[in-house]
Amino acid sequence: MSVLWTIGYEKLRPESLLAELQAAGVERVLDVRLRPQSRKPGMSKTRLGGTLALGGIAYEHRRELGTPPELRELYRSASSEKHARAAAGFREHLEAHERAAVDALAAELADGTAPKTALLCLEEDHEVCHRSVVAEALTERVPGLEVVHL
C-alpha cells in the first residue's frame, strides 16, 4: 500500500515543518500552491526548498495543482457552504484543465518508485484546503493509496 501525506504550514516554522516531514519519513514535498510565495518567513519557494534539501527532502513546485484565483476567495471564507463550493469547483477545474497533471502524478505514485511524497499548502486544516481535493483525485486513480494528513 502506498501512502501520500499532506501538510499545511500555516502555524509552523520552517524547522518545525521539516521535523514533522522527517518524522513521517517524507522524501519529497510537492508544493501545490499556485504561487509559491509566502509572507511567512522561510516558506517561499527558494528558501523552503533550501531548508528541505538540508534535511534530505526534495522540493518540487507543482503550479498546475494550485487553486485558481477565482476559487481562492471561496476557500478563504469561514462559510462551510463556500468551502464546499470551492472544493466542487476545484474538482471540476482539475478534471477539465489539469487532468494530465493529476494523471501523471498518479502514475508516479502507482508505479511504486516515487519517493515518499507529501502535498504542501498553507492551510493548516486539510478539510478546508484544496490539497485534500488533489489527494482525493489521486486516491481515485491509485488503488490502495492511503492519505495521511499531518
Describe each region flagged by the PLM.
Residues 1-150:
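Residues lining hydrophobic/aromatic ligand-binding pockets adjacent to catalytic sites
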